């Protein structure tokens, strides 16, 4: 009987010491539904909670506690109601974040219902801009061709005018040469006439002088 009591006392001492060398079971946390991973296999009250992996908890009983001063211990000291309150606040914060994201998305969508419609509208706008630019380029090319044709026509007209001026100048030069030849002939005729008139005047003078001398003698 005493031997049986000693066995039970040793078993309870073994449980109080918290030594665990088997697989991981929920029963190692005395039914609090905590799941802890103890690296050295020796579960004690002063185990570092950062070295224990907490999977889930529905009780405020602590097994891996470092004290009341640490942040992890303060988090583990929360009751289920407090945890629900914290979770509610986190959900509200997440809701506000999602609301901000949705507003930013709505700003990005510019009034459209989805990114697909927004992208389709943007693609249509890009297509319209491309078609307008292509149309403008076509008009510019046609105007450039028209300008080239006008320049070529103007150049040909200038060439024709220049050739006409050359022909007219040549005809004027030919006419001037003809006039100069005629003037030269007239000048020679006039010089011959003047010489003949001089000869006649000289003869008349000599005849007059001879006639006057005879009368006086």
From Swiss-Prot:
Q: Name one GO molecular function term.
A: protein homodimerization activity
Indicate which residues are glycosylated according to the record: 30
Q: What is its main location?
A: secreted
Q: Output the Pfam families linked to this UniProt entry.
A: Fibin
Q: Where is the signal peptide?
A: 1-18
Q: Provide GO CC annotations from the record.
A: endoplasmic reticulum; extracellular region; Golgi apparatus
- Domain of life where this protein originates: Eukaryota
Q: Which InterPro entries match?
A: Fibin
The subcellular localization recorded is: Secreted; Golgi apparatus; Endoplasmic reticulum
Q: Which UniProt keywords apply?
A: Disulfide bond, Endoplasmic reticulum, Glycoprotein, Golgi apparatus, Secreted, Signal
Family under the similarity heading: Belongs to the FIBIN family.
Subunit architecture: Homodimer; disulfide-linked. Seems to also exist as monomers.
Protein name (Swiss-Prot/TrEMBL): Fin bud initiation factor homolog
The gene coding this protein: Fibin
């Amino acid at each position: 009987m005493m031997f049986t009591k000693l066995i039970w006392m040793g078993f309870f001492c073994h449980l109080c010491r918290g030594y665990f060398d088997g697989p991981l079971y929920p029963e190692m946390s005395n039914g609090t539904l905590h799941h802890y991973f103890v690296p050295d296999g020796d579960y004690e009250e002063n185990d570092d909670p950062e070295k224990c992996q907490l999977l889930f908890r529905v009780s405020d009983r602590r097994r891996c506690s470092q004290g009341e001063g640490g942040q992890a211990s303060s988090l583990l000291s929360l009751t289920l109601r407090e945890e629900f309150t914290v979770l509610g606040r986190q959900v509200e914060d997440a809701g506000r974040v999602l609301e901000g994201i949705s507003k930013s998305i709505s700003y990005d969508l510019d009034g459209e219902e989805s990114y697909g419609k927004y992208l389709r509208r943007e693609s249509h706008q890009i297509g319209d801009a491309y078609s307008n630019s292509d149309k403008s380029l076509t008009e510019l090319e046609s105007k450039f061709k028209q300008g080239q044709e006008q320049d070529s026509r103007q150049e040909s007209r200038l060439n024709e005018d220049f050739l006409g001026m050359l022909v007219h100048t040549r005809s004027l030069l030919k006419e001037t040469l003809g006039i100069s030849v005629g003037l030269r002939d007239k000048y020679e005729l006039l010089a011959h006439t003047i010489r003949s008139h001089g000869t006649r005047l000289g003869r008349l003078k000599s005849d007059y002088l001879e006639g006057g001398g005879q009368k006086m003698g």
